[in-house]
Amino acid sequence: MGQTVTTPLSLTLQHWGDVQRIASNQSVDVKKRRWVTFCSAEWPTFNVGWPQDGTFNLGVISQVKSRVFCPGPHGHPDQVPYIVTWEALAYDPPPWVKPFVSPKPPPLPTAPVLPPGPSAQPPSRSALYPALTPSIKSKPPKPQVLPDSGGPLIDLLTEDPPPYGAQPSSSARENNEEEAATTSEVSPPSPMVSRLRGRRDPPAADSTTSQAFPLRMGGDGQLQYWPFSSSDLYNWKNNNPSFSEDPGKLTALIESVLITHQPTWDDCQQLLGTLLTGEEKQRVLLEARKAVRGNDGRPTQLPNEVNAAFPLERPDWDYTTTEGRNHLVLYRQLLLAGLQNAGRSPTNLAKVKGITQGPNESPSAFLERLKEAYRRYTPYDPEDPGQETNVSMSFIWQSAPDIGRKLERLEDLKSKTLGDLVREAEKIFNKRETPEEREERIRREIEEKEERRRAEDEQRERERDRRRHREMSKLLATVVIGQRQDRQGGERRRPQLDKDQCAYCKEKGHWAKDCPKKPRGPRGPRPQTSLLTLGDXGGQGQEPPPEPRITLKVGGQPVTFLVDTGAQHSVLTQNPGPLSDKSAWVQGATGGKRYRWTTDRKVHLATGKVTHSFLHVPDCPYPLLGRDLLTKLKAQIHFEGSGAQVVGPMGQPLQVLTLNIEDEYRLHETSKEPDVPLGSTWLSDFPQAWAETGGMGLAVRQAPLIIPLKATSTPVSIKQYPMSQEARLGIKPHIQRLLDQGILVPCQSPWNTPLLPVKKPGTNDYRPVQDLREVNKRVEDIHPTVPNPYNLLSGLPPSHQWYTVLDLKDAFFCLRLHPTSQPLFAFEWRDPEMGISGQLTWTRLPQGFKNSPTLFDEALHRDLADFRIQHPDLILLQYVDDLLLAATSEQDCQRGTRALLQTLGNLGYRASAKKAQICQKQVKYLGYLLKEGQRWLTEARKETVMGQPTPKTPRQLREFLGTAGFCRLWIPGFAEMAAPLYPLTKTGTLFNWGPDQQKAYQEIKQALLTAPALGLPDLTKPFELFVDEKQGYAKGVLTQKLGPWRRPVAYLSKKLDPVAAGWPPCLRMVAAIAVLTKDAGKLTMGQPLVILAPHAVEALVKQPPDRWLSNARMTHYQAMLLDTDRVQFGPVVALNPATLLPLPEKEAPHDCLEILAETHGTRPDLTDQPIPDADYTWYTDGSSFLQEGQRRAGAAVTTETEVIWARALPAGTSAQRAELIALTQALKMAEGKKLNVYTDSRYAFATAHVHGEIYRRRGLLTSEGREIKNKNEILALLKALFLPKRLSIIHCPGHQKGNSAEARGNRMADQAAREAAMKAVLETSTLLIEDSTPYTPPHFHYTETDLKRLRELGATYNQTKGYWVLQGKPVMPDQSVFELLDSLHRLTHLSPQKMKALLDREESPYYMLNRDRTIQYVTETCTACAQVNASKAKIGAGVRVRGHRPGTHWEVDFTEVKPGLYGYKYLLVFVDTFSGWVEAFPTKRETAKVVSKKLLEDIFPRFGMPQVLGSDNGPAFASQVSQSVADLLGIDWKLHCAYRPQSSGQVERMNRTIKETLTKLTLASGTRDWVLLLPLALYRARNTPGPHGLTPYEILYGAPPPLVNFHDPEMSKLTNSPSLQAHLQALQAVQQEVWKPLAAAYQDQLDQPVIPHPFRVGDAVWVRRHQTKNLEPRWKGPYTVLLTTPTALKVDGISAWIHAAHVKAATTPPAGTAWKVQRSQNPLKIRLTRGAP
């Protein structure tokens, strides 16, 4: 009862997410509503047995699928995705479908009842199908026995043929055949094709029986059996693809074998078992049994008929008879049909789209592959004429790019057949240039470009020289002329040019842009400058200024300045950005002119960053560095023989260099010569080991790498980002070098990622970097095995003090990529000079790939494994491509280095000679300085941290902490020092840099300056870890003994988690030891560790207090610290806070267990045992339960028989909170008494005894650092614990059934709590925990108005307390009420009703004077609420004005119709408001030009010039073009209210009518060309009756439109049309009887009174914001109303009319404020203000 039946349809709806996922795998999309419609209403009408609840029967699904895929008008293409998904669910069922699917048959089961198979397939052209021949009445000849032959028979197979049933004797066979001939006509058996395999003697048989050997007929007509040979089966198996790879090819093979070899039933099983897998064979047998047809020619499900036609077990067919052979022929036919049906793959159009033409593949071959894909992955036949269009489009789009582009440009492409396209493609394919021709063409183009470039360079040089001479001549001439003009007192201007005079050569007949003497061609590259800048100073083509020059970074961009000590101010020539209002007069050699100043710019100087304002002089030849900036630079200019030099105050060169913060330490490194000079013996002895002499490396022992992709990955193609010409030229040499080395090769790949040019700091060189982020997302992740640099040096013993450091050059390029993985890393590159335009990819492991470091590190480890084995006395450390070799002596180091270089050269790796450090006692490795078994921080690292300025932003602070954190091993207590800095790095935290942060910042810097040398870990010696803890921070130092001293190995520090930070000091020490032991393990590598601390924590770890530690944490600590093989505890020591090392003096150790016992609970005498002489024995309980969907709660304190206290708690109170409230109330009521209190709540009991103290020490935070629940109740309980004189809190089991006092009291408390919860709920429970001290109100100031109102209300004045009292409460004056309610509203922004409800629920100790009126005023004057809250104003409907006759008043609008065919996407609609007549024009654009064109060419000639046009505020109507046309023609164009479609209601409704009609017509006709169907839609709209019962056609012409019924036999009555006079009379009647009444009716509507809106001129209103964004107010304003109509407003600041429904009133200012008039500087203007000035 009550259970529902699960059906296939309901099952799919319950797992709809899985259904959509399966549909997505089939490359289709399904919707739930259509899924239900097709299953329950559509497919049952196909009459193929589909139930309304759905089915997973493959046979029924196949029949529905055949109906859906039926070609022509009877098909259902919209149902294809749904039936394909049904088939996928049944074919490969998910777990929730398998119980509803019939299990697949075992290998050879008894034949089950199979569902009906698919529709009949057309017969294949195969000899398996017997020909229909006329029956022969004559008796067939008797089969002859094989004559005895003396020749030996060839034994092809060792095993005997399969046994068959005993055959009847010849006479019996004769009799049977005669009987058969009399009953039915039997056709003679056709001779079977024999195999040329020799002959074989039949085995001996009984005289009465014989063993038949079908199916080869001998010379005497005897059938013989010739089984398959092993070689045949082997060749067929290995020389053909599997059935899953290419089912069509294997089906064709089996078909040919069935035709030529005529196999028996056993042979067929042997053939299927050899060529197919078990699952494939079962699928073929199932499909074959589906194809069995009954007597009616349709697929049958009758088991007897299916088993008779296609048995699964060996049948007893007699192949010597006609009936037996017919059975076998039918079996082969069904087997072939099963192969064909099973070979069909699920529909997957993506597979078809993936077939593309190869580079050298002919179009014919490509077409065959495309057709085969159609046959395999779609249900469509590519040979079907109806599919020729689809195949043709696929052939064009998927052809090679050059062929596809030319085919797309063929004329009259729609009329081309597939054969025509193939012929055109063959012509294009055969006309392709050969590789030799292409190379010759590229070579010629390169030579021509080089020749053209040389000529342009020569011309440019000549022009540059000529321009310099001309400028100098002009300058000298200007000076002379200027002096002469000064003497003459006049000014001479440059003569004006004539209209046809050239400004360049001054000749007439052409202009400067067409001047033949003006140099042409592209500008050459800018000359390279040797400045440490990130970019050149000027624009493209600008020359750098002459010496002395300097480059500074201005506003983030580098600018090269000419040092000009004669210039007072610095000058910028271009890209100034915003300019200020200031200007200055500049006097130069050519005269004076006024120029403007720029706003302040950030300028990076050598002395720091300054703010400076420049003069913007566009016509200045170069940017000038004047005396103002030279002063800020403190520059010094020296004149030497080589020229002027500009240096800083200390003599250093001035330069700007930008680089990453992590590389800044390299600036401070002292430059030195490379350790390996290029001419040294190391280079000559090992030429193959160095990149400088051995070239690009190649790891010869490493196989090409195959990059596996994720299972769901698909190729990603991202276009190349735009790249500047400078960057392209910068990376071009690198690309060319990699191409020459074979590391890059051209390719064609569906993958593509962009290439980024990255400029190297300090140079103009670029390097290519590929953005492989998208590829990294699609590649399988592998576990990274790169060594950790944190503990890598732990494997370096201090005894090895001779080092060699090698850095492998281009390390990743040493590993090859497999050809199948190379397309993943393709990118675009175009170089016309080299003839490259396409994609390039890497043949080696690329940089930027996420797995490159791990793959290379593992490969190099494998290659160097033999070296480590052969040299056990050497230490070889490897971090990716950085190698460190350590030895005990110089000789061993040199010998090992030679062996390592020889090994690297033989393996194919190359080291950088410039970075090599060979056989030295002091080297730099991974940023450390290694010397004498110790590691130091390099001075460069220290200088980097010390040189960073004080952080101003969280990002700068994170950069500082990251840089300093690298050095934390050298800084004792780093975590405690940096504690004030870390909170400022969190997102959303205000960056407030105070004294604490500055102190921490300076302490870290100071500690870094005094950083000691740390010893390298010696894994042969034990380690000692000294641990201390202070205020939640663990600090320690890891040491090893060196003689009598302890040498530090690392300083460790870490902050404890919030839980451990709240423990007592002894337990915090346990947590600190555990944390630092874990970190020290990274350096000790599991070696013995002795822990020394000022606490005896070993006893605590062995017997930890369970009330402080959880079981999981206790187990973790014990497993780590009680491992005696690795961790041991030393004696208790006192540590020096500065060094964390032990102090010489001894202190008496304390007892940690005793201290923990003292800090165990909250109250020392609190116990859980009953007090014998208690004053009270109470029972507490809290109850919380659901009733009618609402959670009720209550709490009670009782004795065994009576209720002491009971209260209902607010709805939603939890049971735990109720228990705390009950216990707290009991403690309060027993103040000063002895109390035994029982509670059945473990939560309340544990909080009082244990957890409360833990929470208090932890700061009331959880283990995750969040605030605990029931915080206020816990605090109240902890405070109430100290109220009773003596206290015992006892836990008792809940819901006891005994008769003890404890059970009775517990039941009483539980019943009282439930009864209290059912009563009226208290408004708040804060009264239970708040202080009982009465609240004294402050001194109130009452105004005269307040006093008058108080006397009216009958309030009394309290003389002693100094305030008025009403209703027993102090009265709060009006001003105080306003301040309180205004603050409350600003916090909550509640409505007046909600604020009243809130104040009524909270029991306020005051009586608020004029509360309701103040609430209303506060909410109405709130600006935030006015801008956000919705408006409830209701505006009555207005009346639209209509024309008084046809053609005078039109409404016009654009509407978009998608999809747009042939470029038509819009519909311009005109509606006559009088008659409703509609004119619509399809357009390609929505512009004012289109509107004007249709108005003048269509509306005006047919209907006359309109008097009024109405439209919305669209750009096509509100533009100046449309309005100007209307003004010229005298048309009154009325723009309706913005965002108010009802204002244009008639044309908007017509838009909807036309689009709905077009939609119906497209569905009915099956075409998408809505332009073709538009006349039918207009005809419908023009002949639809309006509100007055007349159609627009009848209103215009006075009669219905003429209709002709072409099926009427009497057409004569329709041939005579009315005369012209009759038409004129009808129009006159229409004008009198229709037009005038309609005009009168429209006028009556206008005369009806309309309720106007309440807004008046001068009111302030808020205007609705129609396009709001997130967190943006709904209303804008307020605005002042300027004009009004009955339905719309015009406001100040908005040009369009606004409908009254889109505004709401704004609160007017107080009446006391008045407008004031003020004078302004302009005598024609005055200023109006209101309010305080």
Swiss-Prot record:
Residues 436-476 form a coiled coil. Gene3D superfamilies: 1.10.340.70, 2.30.30.850, 3.10.20.370, 3.30.70.270, Acid Proteases, Gamma-retroviral matrix domain, HIV Type 1 Reverse Transcriptase, subunit A, domain 1, Human Immunodeficiency Virus Type 1 Capsid Protein. CDD domains: RNase_HI_RT_Bel, RP_RTVL_H_like, RT_ZFREV_like. The record marks Y129, P130, F213, P214, L476, A477, L532, T533, L657, T658, L1328, I1329 as: Cleavage. Its EC number is 3.4.23.-, 2.7.7.49, 2.7.7.7, 3.1.26.4. Residues 108-121 have a biased composition (Pro residues). It comes from the Viruses. Mg(2+) 3 binds at D1181, E1219, D1240. A motif (PPXY motif) lies at residues 161-164. Residues 1172-1318 form the RNase H type-1 domain. A zinc finger (CCHC-type) spans 500-517. Disulfide bonds: none annotated. Residues 739-930 form the Reverse transcriptase domain. One of its GO terms (molecular function) is RNA binding. Mg(2+) 4 binds at D1453, D1512. SUPFAM superfamilies: Acid proteases, DNA/RNA polymerases, Retroviral matrix proteins, Retrovirus capsid protein, N-terminal core domain, Retrovirus zinc finger-like domains, Ribonuclease H-like. GO terms for cellular component: host cell plasma membrane; membrane; viral nucleocapsid. A lipid is attached at G2 (N-myristoyl glycine). The modification Phosphoserine is found at S190. Mg(2+) 2 binds at D1181, D1310. Residues 449-464 have a biased composition (Basic and acidic residues). Residues 559-629 form the Peptidase A2 domain. A motif (LYPX(n)L motif) lies at residues 128-132. RNA binds at Y721, D771, R773, P787, N851, P853, K1054, K1055, K1082, S1184, L1186, R1242, R1266. This is Gag-Pol polyprotein. It comes from Xenotropic MuLV-related virus (isolate VP62) (XMRV). The lineage of its organism: Viruses, Riboviria, Pararnavirae, Artverviricota, Revtraviricetes.
